[in-house]
Amino acid sequence: MSQALTATGSSQSNVNLRAMVVGAVGVVFGDIGTSPLYALKECFSPEHGIPFSTAAVLGIISMLFWAMVIVVSLKYVLFVMRADNNGEGGILALMALSLRTANKQSKRMALLTMLGVFGACMFYGDAVITPAISVLSAMEGLEIAAPSLSPFVLPITVVILAALFLIQRGGTSVVGKLFGPVMLVWFAALAALGLVNLMKAPQILVAVNPVYAIAFLHEHALQAFVVLGSVFLVLTGAEALYADMGHFGARPIRWGWFFIVAPSLLLNYFGQGAMLLTDPSTVENPFYRAVPEALQLPMVVLAAAATVIASQAVISGAFSLTSQAIQLGFVPRMRIRYTSEAEIGQIYVPVVNWMLLILVISVVLAFKKSDNLAAAYGIAVTTTMVITTVLAAVVMRSVWRWNPVLVTLVSLGFLVVDMAFFSANLLKIRDGGWFPLMLGGAVFFLLMTWYKGRQLVRARSLEDGIPLEPFLAGLLAHPPHRVEGTAVFLTANIDFVPVSLLHNLKHNRVLHERVIFISFVTRDIPYVDDRCRVTVREFGSGIYLVKAEYGFKETPDVYRVLELGQPQIGSRCELMDTSFFIARESVVPSKLPGMSMWRERLFAWMHQNGAKPSDFFHIPANRVVELGTKVEI
């Protein structure tokens, strides 16, 4: 009997693992999985000045192979994915993990925070380039499959991208179920095409020997260094393996990489290389030239589907990253909509969606060809990869307590490779690499302005703050008129009197029969268990102090907090008998120490245009009382 139960449990576990692997293949590997469309073609770009030869083909294929082995398989899949923050991955999760042992006021804390935020900002540059280059390179297959449609490549690309962003509002949970199967077909097609071409010139397999990569670098020196920036295109999307770890877990992602994705990609790259050895004229577009003529149009359709899926993963990542940044205090509150009742991670951020739409379409129209976009691609990703290595080194030493010598050896080994790719990509700045850097830098500046501005607002508020408990004691000694119902005061600091309470007492001169103060605290972990979320302290006379803790991947829910606190608070808070009091701060730039005047004005503008607290906390407008207050910074 027990053996039967064990067998059943094992079988169910295997089924779940397979389902998770398929799901991961559909979401995690979209970006890196569509790189064969343009990576090898860009490596042989005439602008690099590398004369076509058998040695060049073997050298470049060897570099592609070892780049994937070292950066993706060793660094990300086997090493970085160990640095999970309660199961969550991504650069902000890694930053939060690295800060656990840092002094809150130390320079180390500030430096690690800035590094993590800057790395996250670079993702926004990637989020603009990825959809543009992926869909455009897929549609360029029409130039080979149906030359008469060549003039329509750009318009079709724009239409596909516009449609992709327009459907975000309704959510993608329904079509999302097709992502895994479609990407499985895509990787199967990559593997099959690669295998067919590989059999025509199996001698390409000698490129697994790193001697060919070293010889290529030695022979061509500076030109080979330039090519290294194009070789990096096979690695774009590697960061997603770590970033999406919280959705699928490390094991399904590792299985998906080693047993499906990596073999398919390597077969395709080696197949493209074999085809170049047999027919050098195919260098203009090795991917589509490797496809039999009768299958070229179906392959364009499949490639379009795969690139849309890759783009969707990046767009969803931008929504998720924005939500995390809001919780960590780096971004003003924005309206966030949940597009699925089953999946809490499926969210829609309107402001981010429309900004990405405008930028992506603008990039496609400005660069026009995937070759031109390839020059802009990579530098943002390499920046994030370098920062990931640095933060991982901090985690190794301060959290895992590894031996300093081992930390140095491991981190330096990865850092040498990262810096080689980063340096090679710096050469692309003039040809378009400036765009993602400029975009990421602008986002970083805005985020740091908001973060610094919020610190100043908190500091000014604390200067004039009144300790809550002595104030309540004095208030209850000479109580104002008590009225029926419940008043909920949202406050940033549970130890001080909310400005909204002071204004309510000043103007209305009443106190509700039940008063609840709620303060939200964001922890350095992604999720907080409901059992540990709410702490309630009864002050007496119907007054309660509630502290609600949330992870940086969660969005505060006032109603849920009231439900969790009900056993201590008493009777249920009925919506129609509850008023929510919120202080609406009006920021006034001044000559007080803090930021320069123009940055203070920028912060004031961001503050004014952020989502109202009632919208962010999803409180019905007719139950909210907003009381204004001015804060000089």
UniProtKB/Swiss-Prot annotation:
**Domain of life of the organism encoding this protein:** Bacteria
Q: Which GO terms describe its cellular component?
A: plasma membrane
| Coarse class of the protein's main subcellular location | membrane
**InterPro entries given in the database record:** K+_transporter, K_trans_C, K_trans_N, Kup
> Which keywords accompany this UniProt record?
Cell inner membrane, Cell membrane, Ion transport, Membrane, Potassium, Potassium transport, Symport, Transmembrane, Transmembrane helix, Transport
What is the protein's species of origin?
A: Ralstonia nicotianae (strain ATCC BAA-1114 / GMI1000)
Instruction: Output the lineage of the source organism.
Output: Bacteria, Pseudomonadati, Pseudomonadota, Betaproteobacteria, Burkholderiales
Described function: Transport of potassium into the cell. Likely operates as a K(+):H(+) symporter.
Protein name, please?
Probable potassium transport system protein Kup 2
Query: Keyword Chloroplast, does the record have it?
Result: no
Compartment list: Cell inner membrane
What are the TM regions of this chain, as residue ranges? 20-40, 52-72, 109-129, 147-167, 178-198, 221-241, 257-277, 299-319, 347-367, 376-396, 404-424, 431-451
Say which family it is in.
Belongs to the HAK/KUP transporter (TC 2.A.72) family.
The reaction(s) annotated as catalysed by this protein in its Swiss-Prot or TrEMBL entry are: K(+)(in) + H(+)(in) = K(+)(out) + H(+)(out)
Q: How does it sit in the membrane?
A: Multi-pass membrane protein
GO MF annotation, one: potassium ion transmembrane transporter activity
Q: Which PANTHER family match?
A: LOW AFFINITY POTASSIUM TRANSPORT SYSTEM PROTEIN KUP, OSMOTIC STRESS POTASSIUM TRANSPORTER
